[in-house]
């Protein structure tokens, strides 16, 4: 079976690309021939490409620019019409006509569109995009119900061809470690009487860190022993 996976870029700081990497590294690439069509890695980030290529994933890296990527995708599909599945990770309105383009150029493929975003406000253009996505795609995924509704329409979760695809974490990589815990708390001046709340993730709009600060302020007002540790970087 031949699969074309379409992601944003190869950088490790991309939440979408990390999801793609986790997914593909657990896929049997002897059974499923996977081509990853993706933007080039930003110069300030490490690339996910080495691990994916070592696992047998073919990577087609193109300029990390929307217009250039769309042109390159069209050119690729004109000469590669034998994909069984196209899995398209999307977070934009422009993805809707791109979905139509994929249907025209690769008519036998099953098209999966996968939403990773909730970014209000809802506009008339977005509502038009809902109709286009639903006209051309076969299956719909969202990292949550809200993400599915935002990109594909209010009632998409009522459809049998919609599913939530959770951004899974390998729990086996995490386990209690008393020595590491003590060292980390000492390094950050956290005493045995302090209570620690933690956040691990990107500091951007989607993760809603401002609301986290409001919640923490209420917790600290009730008990001054609370401290908040943020692990991550981002636009905010």
Describe each model-derived feature in a short phrase.
Residues 3, 85, 102-119, 141:
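Active-site proximal beta-strand in glycosyltransferases
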Residues 5-67, 161, 234:
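N-terminal strand-loop element at the rim of the active site
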Residues 14-22, 195-218, 224, 228, ...:
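A conserved mid-protein helix/loop that constitutes part of the nucleotide-sugar donor-binding site
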Residues 50, 54-85, 95-105, 124-135, ...:
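An amphipathic, basic-hydrophobic alpha-helix
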Residues 67-71, 110, 117-137, 149-156:
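Nucleotide-sugar donor phosphate/pyrophosphate-binding loop at the beta->alpha transition
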Residues 88-96, 115:
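Short His-centered aromatic/hydrophobic patch
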Residues 137-175:
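A short, active-site helix/loop in glycosyltransferases that binds the activated sugar's phosphate group
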Residues 175-190:
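A short helix/loop element that forms part of the nucleotide-sugar donor recognition site in Leloir-type
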């Amino acid at each position: 079976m031949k699969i074309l996976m379409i992601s944003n870029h190869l950088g490790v700081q991309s939440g979408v690309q990390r999801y793609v990497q986790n997914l593909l590294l657990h896929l049997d690439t002897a059974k499923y021939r996977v081509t990853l069509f993706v933007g080039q890695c930003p110069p300030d980030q490490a690339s996910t490409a080495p691990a994916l290529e070592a696992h047998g994933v073919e990577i087609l890296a193109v300029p990390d620019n929307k217009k250039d990527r769309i042109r390159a995708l069209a050119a690729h599909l004109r000469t590669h019409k034998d994909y069984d599945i196209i899995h398209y990770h999307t977070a934009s309105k422009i993805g809707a006509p791109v979905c139509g383009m994929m249907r025209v150029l690769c008519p036998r493929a099953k098209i999966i569109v996968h939403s990773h975003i909730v970014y209000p406000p809802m506009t008339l253009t977005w509502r038009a995009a809902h109709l286009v996505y639903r006209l051309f795609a076969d299956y719909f995924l969202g990292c949550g119900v809200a993400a599915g509704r935002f990109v594909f329409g209010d009632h998409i979760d009522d459809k049998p061809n919609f599913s939530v695809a959770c951004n899974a974490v390998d729990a086996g990589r995490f386990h209690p470690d008393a020595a590491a815990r003590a060292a980390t708390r000492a390094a950050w001046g956290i005493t045995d009487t302090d209570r620690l709340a933690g956040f691990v993730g990107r500091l951007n709009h989607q993760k809603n860190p401002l609301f986290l600060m409001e919640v923490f302020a209420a917790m600290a007002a009730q008990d001054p022993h609370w401290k908040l540790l943020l692990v991550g970087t981002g636009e905010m």
